UniProtKB/Swiss-Prot annotation:
Organism: Kocuria rhizophila (strain ATCC 9341 / DSM 348 / NBRC 103217 / DC2201)
Biological processes per GO annotation: negative regulation of DNA-templated transcription initiation
Keyword DNA-binding: yes
Protein name: Transcriptional regulator MraZ
Xref: HAMAP family: MraZ
UniProt keyword annotations, A-Z: Cytoplasm, DNA-binding, Repeat, Transcription, Transcription regulation
């Protein structure tokens, strides 16, 4: 499970050093892809296979499902961390997420997310205020 917030930097070769706590789960390989709110999703290969299976069950007659799957999968990149726990983030994904050198890597349960640090701070500032007011119905049965 991915938890916490980390603030790494991209190096000059567009490589990210994965947080140490994430490396074991991602050591055998991972998939980077476009996420909502202009971040990148980071899935273990195993979790990505589950996500892909869910997508395969979507009706091909749904234009919205086809569009989502095309955008999601066409931007996906499979990576294997090097011995130092580094991965290269492709230029197209860096551009999509507006990544500069300063990043925020957050744990989001079954996945990690990579954000531009300033974008993450702005998102958190906007959403954190309403967090304590969130209705139970958002995630039924959680509390």
């Amino acid at each position: 499970m991915f938890l916490g917030t980390y603030e790494p930097r991209l190096d000059d070769k567009a490589r990210l050093i994965l947080p140490a706590k994430f490396r074991a789960e991602l050591a055998e390989g991972l998939v980077l892809t476009r996420g909502q709110e202009r971040c990148l999703y980071v899935f273990s290969a195993e979790e990505f296979a589950r996500v892909h299976e869910q997508m395969r069950s979507a009706p091909l007659s749904s234009k919205q499902a086809r569009d989502y799957i095309r955008v999601f999968l066409s931007g996906a990149s499979d990576e294997v961390p090097d011995k130092q726990g580094r991965i290269t983030i492709p230029a197209s994904l860096r551009s999509y997420a507006g990544l500069d050198r300063e990043l925020a890597v957050i744990g989001a349960g079954s996945r990690a997310e990579i954000w531009d640090a300033a974008a993450w701070q702005q998102y958190l500032q906007e959403k954190e205020a309403a967090f304590s007011e969130t209705e139970e119905e958002v995630i039924p049965g959680l509390f």
